[in-house]
Amino acid sequence: MKVKKGGGGAGTGAEHAPGASGPNVEPKPELQAESESGSESEPEAGPGPRPGPLQRKQPIGPEDVLGLQRITGDYLCSPEENIYKIDFVRFKIRDMDSGTVLFEIKKPPASERLPINPRDLDPNAGRFVRYQFTPAFLRLRQVGATVEFTVGDKPVNNFRMIERHYFRNQLLKSFDFHFGFCIPSSKNTCEHIYDFPALSEELINEMIRHPYETQSDSFYFVDDRLVMHNKADYSYSGTP
């Protein structure tokens, strides 16, 4: 299934061009505690960040995240809320103009993964990705991102992803994809088409000079209820 999205913006993916490196999956960096409305959180007694208004709101729906104007201060749902056991196992991006595969990564089957002690497992492992690109990625016009994912024994109705990209907390682009219905215990594949805008030279240079200040939130909904939230940041300098 191929999904076409309207508009353009800063896209995701990693470029396998000379001088570029693939994505490094790293633990989520410590994030500044801020409210999702864009204002800084007020001091609160006790350790830990103060939850923003969306973290206190349950359930969270698509309209809630479509109103965000800056990167969230933390994850808006826990891994346990993925009751449908949605698991992304393959990701590939290609330049739509040339057809060149820019990057491809595949998760090994469960039978080939090393055993992990549950006590040592980071609950946020796999929810944050750090990408490293060459500057040339910012000049691509259109990229296709193929995702392959499995679901558990529950039917998945109205599966939807909203992905919002920011540079220095300025919204660059919001993407909205509808996966539709997924039958239980199925493996699914679809390609999302990212149309990139023509960025100004000034903005391109700023994004290159300030690695990892380009960030994104990816929100996944089933029946208009948030069940997964992933984060990423991006460097376009071509170096770690």
Swiss-Prot record:
Tetradecanoate binds at Y131. The modification Phosphoserine is found at S37, S39, S41. GO terms for cellular component: centrosome; cytoplasm; intercellular bridge; spindle midzone; spindle pole. It holds the Pfam family GMP_PDE_delta. Involved in synaptic functions in photoreceptor cells, the signal transduction in immune cells as a Src family kinase activator, endosome recycling, the uptake of bacteria and endocytosis, protein trafficking in sensory neurons and as lipid-binding chaperone with specificity for a diverse subset of myristoylated proteins. Specifically binds the myristoyl moiety of a subset of N-terminally myristoylated proteins and is required for their localization. Binds myristoylated GNAT1 and is required for G-protein localization and trafficking in sensory neurons. GO terms for biological process: endocytosis; lipoprotein transport; mitotic cytokinesis; negative regulation of caveolin-mediated endocytosis; negative regulation of clathrin-dependent endocytosis; nervous system development; visual perception. Residues 1-60 are annotated as: Disordered. Residues 1-12 have a biased composition (Gly residues). Signal peptide: none annotated. It comes from the Eukaryota. InterPro entries: Ig_E-set, PDE6D_unc-119_myristoyl-bd, PDED_dom, PDED_dom_sf. Adopts an immunoglobulin-like beta-sandwich fold forming a hydrophobic cavity that captures N-terminally myristoylated target peptides. Phe residues within the hydrophobic beta sandwich are required for myristate binding. Keywords: Cytoplasm, Cytoskeleton, Endocytosis, Lipid-binding, Phosphoprotein, Protein transport, Sensory transduction, Transport, Vision. Interacts with CABP4; in the absence of calcium. May interact with GTP-bound ARL1. Interacts with ARL2 and ARL3 (GTP-bound forms); this promotes the release of myristoylated cargo proteins. Found in a complex with ARL3, RP2 and UNC119; RP2 induces hydrolysis of GTP ARL3 in the complex, leading to the release of UNC119. Interacts with NPHP3 (when myristoylated). Interacts with CYS1 (when myristoylated). Interacts with MACIR; interaction only takes place when UNC119 is not liganded with myristoylated proteins. Interacts with LCK; this interaction plays a crucial role in activation of LCK. Phosphorylation suppresses its interaction with KLHL18 and down-regulates its KLHL18-mediated degradation. Phosphorylated more under light conditions than dark conditions. Dephosphorylated by calcineurin. It is found in: Cytoplasm, Cytoskeleton, Microtubule organizing center, Centrosome; Cytoplasm, Cytoskeleton, Spindle; Cytoplasm, Cytoskeleton, Spindle pole. This is Protein unc-119 homolog A. Its main location: cytoplasm. One of its GO terms (molecular function) is lipid binding. The keyword Metal-binding does not apply.
